[in-house]
C-alpha cells in the first residue's frame, strides 16, 4: 500500500444484515465499486468485544441498546482496501439513521426504523485512526492478505501490460 490514497477500512455487516440474508448483496456493492476485500470472517461479537469497539459511546443513552443489537446474532467483519476507501465506504453506507440515508445507499436501501430502535445493517470506520484501531480489534495481521485483482493492471497507469503490473506487484512469485 505505498500509495497514500490507498486505505484500509473495517466494515461490519451487522446481525440484521446477516439474518435478513443481505450479506451477498452488500458485499457485491463494495466489489463492484472496485474495493478489494483483504480480510473477511463471520463472528458472533461478544459483549466484551462490542464494548471495546463502541467504547467512545459508553455512558450515552444508546450504548446498551447498541451493545444488545451488535451481540444479538452473528456479524460479518471485513477489511476492504482501495483509493480513499474510508470515505468511499462511508458514503456508500449512508447516514447512520436509515430515515436520513439517501436511497441508493446501503442504509437507505436496507436500514429499518422500527420506532424504538434503528437497524442500520452496517458499520464503517469513520477515520484512518478508527479504521486502524477497529481492524486490530477484529483481525490478526496474518488474517489480512495482499493480492492482485485480475483487473488491477487495467487501472494501474504506470504499467503498460498486465504482466508488467503483476511483475511490479510481485504477484507471480506468490
Swiss-Prot record:
GO CC annotations on file: cytoplasm
EC number: 2.7.4.6
Cofactor(s) this protein requires: Mg(2+)
Magnesium as UniProt keyword: yes
Entry keyword set: ATP-binding, Cytoplasm, Kinase, Magnesium, Metal-binding, Nucleotide metabolism, Nucleotide-binding, Phosphoprotein, Transferase
Residues that bind ATP: 14, 62, 90, 96, 107
One function term, GO molecular function aspect: nucleoside diphosphate kinase activity
Cellular localization per UniProt: Cytoplasm
Active site residues of this protein: 123
Magnesium recorded as keyword: yes
Principal subcellular localization: cytoplasm
Pfam family, one: NDK
SMART domains tied to this protein: NDK
GO biological process: CTP biosynthetic process; GTP biosynthetic process; UTP biosynthetic process
Database matches in HAMAP family: NDP_kinase
Functional description taken from the UniProt entry: Major role in the synthesis of nucleoside triphosphates other than ATP. The ATP gamma phosphate is transferred to the NDP beta phosphate via a ping-pong mechanism, using a phosphorylated active-site intermediate.
Family of the protein in this entry: Belongs to the NDK family.
NCBIfam families: PRK00668.1
Protein name in UniProt: Nucleoside diphosphate kinase
Protein species of origin: Thermococcus kodakarensis (strain ATCC BAA-918 / JCM 12380 / KOD1) (Pyrococcus kodakaraensis (strain KOD1))
